[in-house]
Amino acid sequence: MLLAQQLNLYILKGEIIMKKIKIAIVFGGQSTEHEVSRNSVTSILKNINRDKYEICPIGITKEGKWFQYTGDINNIKNGQWEKDNKNKLENGYNVLFNKEVELVFPVLHGLYGEDGTIQGLCKLVGLPCVGPGVLSSALCMDKIYTKYVLENFKFKQANYVVVNKFEYEKNKEEIIKEVEKLQYDVFIKPANSGSSVGITKAHNKEELLKGLEEAFIHDKNVLVEEAINAREIEVAVLGNDDPKAAVPGEIIPAKEFYDYEAKYQNENSELLIPANIDNIKQEEIKELAIKIYKLLGCSGLARVDFLMDKESNEVYFNEVNTLPGFTKISMYPKLWEASGKSYSALIDELIELAINNK
């Protein structure tokens, strides 16, 4: 009987029947990546195996209201689900707090989704959650603290300066002088944002000042990094204690760098899968990705991004994304597809990893 429960089976009239696992798939949210989340979850809902799972979609509006949604999946992608009052039930919170589901699959990009917030909620109510836990999610979300940790372990990174809004407003000239010890061009990044939201590239002091003001809209702490003439390489990592890496991919941005528009609105950006690098370098990058994944305490999944110098081929750590984009054309699932794992099989494995991640 215990074995049957572990395998999610029950017996009906002498036949072994697989009991469906009830999963809450949470989407939307209050971050600037709300629309990205809707795209990702639409793809997941269309490809998840309904023979294995009973799905309970839970949408969070930009205002922070939770609803269970039972209507047309296509209404999620275009945002019309919020107006579909007939299929919008005001019990989104209760589904989790009353443990009406067995597992939570958060498809919430950015703040309140991959920063440890919903992971903490799941831990509090005792529900398994797809992806990394509270600490690793929070750590990887903050670009500055991720850099501090990996710097301690001697991983190569671009030269950088951290700017705090309060200190900047008190000592503007002094801080600009410190930042300008870096060589232009520089990237200016809010510490906690994904999908390149709020990121700008500065070629001079005037653009630096504008970029800092833009970044401070999104976060009080900002990372200013020296730009490297580099190729953008991304690695999909999957697993708990013994993670594996897919073939690396490369991004050829349509613009000067891979900002929000280039990612989601400009169809001229290219994804090269696998990246056009030799096998020895591919293995080196995959090993680096797995080391970083384990050092940061990740589980389930993450995408580890690197910069590879176009002249020296030196590899520099860029960032970790613990809940990467999940449309069928997103890099993370496409890298696994190129490595022999279908989109549906990837979803299955993520759910299994969450269940087994004690």
From Swiss-Prot:
It catalyses: 2 D-alanine + ATP = D-alanyl-D-alanine + ADP + phosphate + H(+). Binds 2 magnesium or manganese ions per subunit. It comes from the Bacteria. Keywords: ATP-binding, Cell shape, Cell wall biogenesis/degradation, Cytoplasm, Ligase, Magnesium, Manganese, Metal-binding, Nucleotide-binding, Peptidoglycan synthesis. PROSITE patterns: ATP_GRASP, DALA_DALA_LIGASE_1, DALA_DALA_LIGASE_2. Its EC number is 6.3.2.4. It holds the Pfam family Dala_Dala_lig_C. Mg(2+) 2 binds at E319, N321. Mg(2+) 1 binds at D305, E319. It is found in: Cytoplasm. Its main location: cytoplasm. SUPFAM superfamilies: Glutathione synthetase ATP-binding domain-like, PreATP-grasp domain. One of its GO terms (molecular function) is ATP binding. GO terms for cellular component: cytosol. Pathway: Cell wall biogenesis; peptidoglycan biosynthesis. Residues 147-352 form the ATP-grasp domain. ATP binds at residues 179-234. Its cofactor is Mg(2+); Mn(2+). NCBIfam families: D_ala_D_alaTIGR, PRK01372.1, PRK01966.1-4. This is D-alanine--D-alanine ligase B. The lineage of its organism: Bacteria, Bacillati, Bacillota, Clostridia, Eubacteriales.
